[in-house]
């Protein structure tokens, strides 16, 4: 019985680490995309002047997707186990690759929206993993990491933009 508990705990910790790192990557992608939104709009509209509303579509759609994801995440978790639900969220998060290679602004917007869905689901599932698999004396540390994960991602982007700004914004 003790071996089974240790295996379950180690799997839970591994799942938590994967979800935490995934959310940090999501946050980095989100912050970088937000910081580069002017250049992204300029790129997709070939330098033409567009309504400020068009350039804000990304932020609004991602906010809507994240609200939707928070509501749907619990339902998906009830229908699937935490591992399968997390895999679904990670697959949705992979739509960031579609966004990077999108050929038009609207495909980019849809891909970012789906990616945001996955990111929000990951946040919900991290809390579930903490509650289910992390020992009570370690939960406060895990919860602090969950809370800090977005800021860690944003901090990484700030460091990268500070050190490599010319490289990051060139060749748009």
Task: List the predicted regions and their residue ranges.
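Paired small-residue
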Residues: 106-114
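Conserved MFS/SLC helix-loop-helix module at the cytosolic interface between two early adjacent transmembrane helices
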Residues: 68-103
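Residue-level signature of mid-helix packing/kink "hotspots" within the transmembrane helices
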Residues: 31, 62-71, 155
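Small-residue-rich transmembrane alpha-helices and their cytosolic helix-loop interfaces
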Residues: 23, 59, 63, 143-151
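Extracytoplasmic
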Residues: 14-45, 52
